[in-house]
Regions:
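Metal-dependent enolase-superfamily TIM-barrel catalytic cores that perform enediolate-based chemistry
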Residues: 1-79
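Catalytic cores of large soluble enzymes that bind and process phosphate-bearing ligands
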Residues: 11-18, 116, 141, 202
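Structural signal for hydrophobic packing residues in well-ordered secondary-structure cores
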Residues: 27-30, 57, 153-157, 215-218
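Shared catalytic-loop signature of beta/alpha-barrel
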Residues: 57, 68-85, 90-200
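Extended hydrophobic packing segments that form well-structured cores
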Residues: 200-236
Length: 236
């Protein structure tokens, strides 16, 4: 669940109320939620927001600060009991290791498309396990990346939850996670789970003809930018 709209370095405490109210509403219908700060919140407000959310017991808070701020994230993790999640902007075991050594993270979220594929994400998971840290791979992406993550999840003892893009709000037009495969039924969700794929390879069959057709005239995708109130570049 997205955390907040953009906040100033120091903002009115009332600017945090919407995030807290939305979490309360989700919990009221018997569901759990993690809260994604997207690294857009600065330390003065992140401390307040983490404390305000804590009584409502989110599953985790994600990227409460930019990943460059290892010591500040460690301090925040000592301030609240809520698990700290991060890792989509960390691209290797070497990027991950300082957070593990500092005790700054409880749930690592490596992205298989960023960190070098199946081999490296398995090494990251194994390294995290030695620090009693879970993994929840970042993947608001397509079927190939998700299928690869599912195969890793089936072998990682410290895997806890998998992000997926099915029905996500920024899918383009009529395209979704199920659009590019001959066997979209592998993504059927029942009770919050999908079945482990049994097909060859990653377990999905790509509709290559459809991919070629939809890619005609396509332009390179550029990550959107998110600007702060003073014109500063924020994380997306």
């Amino acid at each position: 669940m997205n955390g907040t709209e953009d906040l100033g370095w120091l903002d009115s405490p009332t600017a945090l109320d919407d995030c807290v109210d939305r979490l309360k509403a989700v919990k009221a219908i018997g569901m759990d939620a993690g809260i994604d700060f997207h690294g857009r919140v600065h330390k003065p407000m992140a401390k307040q927001l983490a404390k305000a959310l804590e009584p409502h017991r989110p599953m985790f808070i994600e990227e409460p600060l930019l990943s460059e701020h290892i010591n500040e994230i460690k301090d925040l993790s000592r301030l609240v009991g809520t698990p700290i999640a991060l890792g989509e902007r960390l691209h290797s075991r070497w990027d991950v290791r300082p957070f593990l050594e500092a005790g700054a993270v409880d749930i690592l979220q490596p992205d298989i498309s960023h960190c070098g594929g199946i081999s490296e994400i398995r090494r990251i998971a194994a390294l995290a396990e030695t620090y009693d840290v879970a993994i929840a791979p970042h993947c608001p992406l397509g079927p190939i990346a998700l299928a690869a993550n599912v195969q890793v999840a089936a072998t990682a003892a410290n895997f806890v939850i998998q992000e997926m893009s099915l029905g996500i709000h920024y899918n383009d037009g009529n395209q979704d996670l199920t659009s590019y495969t001959h066997n979209p039924e592998v993504w059927n969700v029942e009770g919050g789970y999908i079945k482990l794929m049994q097909g060859p390879g990653l377990g999905i069959e790509i509709d290559e003809e459809q991919v070629r057709r939809l890619s005609e005239g396509a332009v390179p995708w550029i990550s959107p930018t998110f600007m702060g109130p003073g014109g500063e570049l924020r994380e997306w």
